[in-house]
């Protein structure tokens, strides 16, 4: 009898089969119904993910550009400071031969008994120095017997003019003025006739 009882339990009952079929059908329908909802969520999630990725990429690009700009700014600041610090190097190197000439003249002063030779040596040094200044764009401001020009000259004294023609003109230059590429770098100090 036990065998029969076991057989009955093993053989599925038609009622149980229909219940199982209904459950499977219902779960399958639920899956089908939830599939469009999941697709809609994916569609909504995709743009959000895309925008998030795009935002991250833009932030990364922004940070890189800011770092690059900061490095550029630091590099140019360093270059400018080096130019300011070492900008006069060429000028000073070119002046060294003039200093050498002065040193030679000073060392030979004791041996020279002729003032004409000393004068000639100093004139050579002066000429060499003035040539160098002209190559750099430095020029003397000519003032002799010219009308007083306040843009180029500073009047340090006014004296009675020796003649009527010299009234308002430069009579003497106390300190020579210079221009660098047509810009006054030192005004001439002059005596003007009144």
Swiss-Prot record:
Q: Give the UniProt entry's GO cellular component terms.
A: cytoplasm
The UniProt record describes its induction as: Low level background expression highly induced by oxidative stress due to hydrogen peroxide.
TM helices/strands, residue ranges: none
Q: Which InterPro entries match?
A: GrpE, GrpE_coiled_coil, GrpE_head
Question: What keyword terms does UniProt attach to this protein?
Answer: Chaperone, Cytoplasm, Stress response
Molecular functions (GO terms): adenyl-nucleotide exchange factor activity; protein homodimerization activity; protein-folding chaperone binding; unfolded protein binding
Look up the further comments and give them: The grpE-dnaJ-PG1777-PG1778-PG1779 genes are co-transcribed and may form an operon.
Please give the name of this protein: Protein GrpE
């Amino acid at each position: 009898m036990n065998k029969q009882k076991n057989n009955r339990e093993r053989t599925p009952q038609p009622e149980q089969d229909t219940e199982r079929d209904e459950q499977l059908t219902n779960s399958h329908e639920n899956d089908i119904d939830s599939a469009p909802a999941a697709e809609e969520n994916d569609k909504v999630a995709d743009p959000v993910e895309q925008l998030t990725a795009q935002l991250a990429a833009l932030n990364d690009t922004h940070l890189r550009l800011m770092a690059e700009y900061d490095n550029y700014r630091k590099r140019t600041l360093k270059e400018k400071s080096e130019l300011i610090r070492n900008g006069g190097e060429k000028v000073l190197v070119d002046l060294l031969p003039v200093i050498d000439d002065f040193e030679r003249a000073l060392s030979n002063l004791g041996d020279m008994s002729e003032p004409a030779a000393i004068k000639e040596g100093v004139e050579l040094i002066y000429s060499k120095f003035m040539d160098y200044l002209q190559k750099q764009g430095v020029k003397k401001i000519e003032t002799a017997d010219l009308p007083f020009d306040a843009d180029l000259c500073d009047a340090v004294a006014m004296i009675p003019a020796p003649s009527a023609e010299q009234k308002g003109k430069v009579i003497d230059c106390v300190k020579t003025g210079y221009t660098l590429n047509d810009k006054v770098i030192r005004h001439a100090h002059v005596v003007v006739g009144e």
